[in-house]
Amino acid sequence: MITTLTTLFATLFDREQLLQQARSLHAIERLKKIHPADSVLALVRSAVGDERPSIATARRQFQALTGYRPEESSFYERLTPGLANLCWKTFLGALSKATHVQRREVARALGLKVRDIRAVDASVVSLPERAAKHLPSTDSRLGGFKITAALSLLEDLLVSAHITDARQHDRKAFGLPKDVEGVLWIHDRGYADHRLFAHIADGKGYFLIRLKSSSQPIVRSIRSGLAQCHLGKHLSRELPVHGVVDLDAEFTVGRNQTRVFRVVGIPVARNKQGRADWIWLATNLPESTPATTVGTFYRLRWMIETLFRALKGIGRFDEVPSGNPAVICAFIGSTLIGLVLSQAICVAMRVERPGSEPSLMRVFALVLSNLSDLAAAFHSHRLEAALEPFVAALWREGVNPNPGRPYARDRHLATVAA
């Protein structure tokens, strides 16, 4: 595990590589005493530290890392669009170096050859009113941005993150990548676009997307949960369904085309209004995948809510106090660097000890508290020795403190793999 972490931290701590990237991105004009690697580390610690993230906090973190306290104006001048791009590029570099772990037994539960299962969702973060000019919000008194993230459920890693202003609709903020083949995409109602269904299916991918109440396709065949006399009717929520519903329905795609996709209805004891209800899921998973398994896979979508809680709780995504778009983007990239490092460490822990339950929240906090010491050890070629107490702390403090109550992710994955 120490070898894995050495490679992982080298991505962030390689000063020469970061300096070359900074020059290519015009993040610096002259080196002087403020090295871009130290600036990025200071921003990461400021973004996910104990204090409110701000330029003043980042300046103090810079002093803690280097022993040098730059003038406020000098430090602020370094927070340029180039430095914001450097933070984002470093985040993408950490993303590409993350260790991958395939859960083949989960793929077998689907009865399909899938490369990955990805949950997509978005979360809105409020910003001060002075940011509204560049990042407008739905509230005219505030600015805001929306982060649209794709999370690999098999690898428990962030796959992509896209930033837009807060007014952007969920569907428009999500761009379907080219590598859809063999990937199961899980989305909430904000992405219930029939054209998206068709694009994923045409790309030889799979989808599992919750339907809006306004989506009422025509019932074409019924396997369970609805009487055959309702063939040819619109799938209205008033139809007399019972138990788990499994059927095929015809969707309108665009103006003139139609496509037939599978629809699964999963009963829930109580909805938000306290009444019995059904969750309706559109999918192109074949009939050989049981309807109950389809419902269990959709429950895994809540893993991405845990990711957003980590970003807003430990990363304090919603506490960026600036109206400067370069500063905002720098703090966003810095927070995501800390998150990806923490996720990759969790994956390495699962590889080292199969069956262990690392906690993203706890590991995130440990990364924060040890980041400066690990960076200093890397620069003095003592990283491997410094990693030994860090790894010991991970196993002591970074795992589920109550193994008798497994986390939802492990519980649901165990269910579908059984």
Locations of the language-model features?
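Single, function-defining residue in the core of a domain
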Residues: 1-55, 61, 69-70, 75-77, ...
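Blade-loop segments of beta-propeller domains
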Residues: 66
